[in-house]
Regions:
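Generic secondary-structure signature for well-ordered alpha-helical cores
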Residues: 13-20, 62-65, 122-125, 145, ...
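Zn2+-dependent cytidine deaminase-like catalytic core
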Residues: 32-139, 282-284
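Hydrophobic packing residues within well-ordered alpha-helices of enzyme cores
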Residues: 93, 140, 144-147, 210, ...
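N-terminal glycine-rich anion-binding loops that anchor highly charged ligand groups
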Residues: 22-36
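Short, compositionally biased "basic patch" segments
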Residues: 30-31, 51-56, 60, 154-164, ...
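Proteins enriched for Cys/Gly/acidic motifs involved in redox and nucleic-acid/cofactor modification
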Residues: 21-22, 48-49, 128-163
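The conserved SAM/SAH-binding core of class I Rossmann-like methyltransferase domains
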Residues: 29, 104, 229
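Enzymes that bind and transform nitrogen-containing heteroaromatic metabolites
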Residues: 1-26, 41, 85, 118, ...
Length: 338
């Protein structure tokens, strides 16, 4: 009991390894403990593969140190109680003889929410919610913010990334913007964010001017779905997004809001928007932005204003991250957060 936080923290770290690779499922981690020692651990790696609890049980069996019988399993999300593409996790827990389950976050899926505790209790397994460190609970909840949004609304969790100068400009008078963010901030918000999201969205002008690949070098299999917003549909046929041979599809839509909703129907759980102010504004003004990540560089551009600002007051919780010579603000829309 006293070490619950220690083992739950390990489960959270394991869960993070699955971010961006489990759609439409959530990223979940699990740790099995017996006699105060970890005897098995695992995380959900991809949809259709073992859930975290099953992966941890199999890991314990392979290690052969101790049987899971009578052990405690720590899970970042309430175990599922109904079979899907794989069996229900509560059945695997019961079959392994695990006697105690500690989970961090209730499953937001109405099909499973609250049902694990009742089912496990009938089998003589104690199931309880983790009551420790509030910061740790927030980390566990943040792991499933995209899943929560998608499973309750059918709409992906949308993150908008913008880079700007101290005077609020995202490019100079000639449209140059690549040099605003530092190398450190590009690594943080580029490769890292692309790796943990299911899809990346940009506008047609980004494709025409920058010809980006929009892939993540650190992403396994490069299965990031690329989305281009173009009202006219006129895009260069030789653009990298169409010719680089990546296994994932490049999708073209004429409207950003429509694209987000269609992506949700396709099972896309999270979308990273790397377009400019116009694309960000089109999503914000219809209430589709969940998270803003703004890179603020220590430069003053002094360019002419570029279009109107985003209308409406943003209702956000804000934090700041130092990143090389720049700093990054991370803003979460409060709606829908527990």
């Amino acid at each position: 009991m006293e070490r619950d936080a220690e083992f739950m923290e390990r489960a959270v770290k394991l869960a993070a390894r699955g971010l961006g690779h489990t759609r439409p499922n959530p990223a979940v981690g699990a740790v099995i403990v017996k006699g105060g020692k970890i005897i098995g651990e695992g995380w959900h790696k991809k949809a259709g593969g073992d859930h975290a609890e099953v992966a941890a049980i199999k890991n314990a069996t392979r290690r052969g140190l101790k049987s899971p019988k009578g052990a405690t399993i720590y899970v970042t999300l309430e175990p599922c109680s109904k079979p899907g593409r794989v069996g229900a996790c509560i059945d695997a827990i019961i079959a392994a003889g695990i006697s105690r389950v500690v989970y961090a976050i209730p499953d937001p899926n109405p099909t499973n929410c609250g049902k694990a505790k009742r089912a496990l209790a009938r089998a003589g397994v104690n199931c309880e919610r983790f009551k420790g460190d509030a910061d740790l609970l927030k980390l566990a909840d943040d792991l499933i913010c995209d899943f929560r949004k998608h499973v309750t609304t059918g709409i992906p969790y949308v993150t908008v990334k913008l880079a700007m100068s101290l005077d609020g400009k995202i490019c100079d008078d000639f449209g140059n913007a690549k040099w605003i963010s530092s190398a450190d901030s590009r690594r943080l918000t580029g490769s890292t964010l692309r790796e943990i999201n299911d899809a990346i969205m940009v506008g047609a002008e980004t494709v025409r001017k920058d010809n980006p690949s929009l892939l993540s070098h650190g992403r396994r299999n490069n299965d990031l779905v690329r989305v281009i917003i173009s009202k006219s549909g006129r895009l260069p046929k030789n653009a990298q997004v169409f010719t680089d041979g990546a296994p994932n599809k490049t999708l073209v839509f004429d409207d950003a809001a429509k694209a987000v909703r269609e992506l949700g129907k396709m099972g896309i759980v999270s979308v990273l928007c790397e377009g400019g102010l116009k694309l960000a504004r089109s999503l914000a003004e219809v209430g589709l932005v969940d998270q803003w990540i703004t890179i603020v560089a220590p430069v003053v551009i002094g360019a002419r204003p570029i279009g109107k600002a985003i209308r409406g007051r943003l209702n956000v919780d804000e934090s700041f991250i130092a990143c090389g010579d720049s700093f990054v603000t991370v803003d979460f829309e409060r709606r829908g957060r527990p």
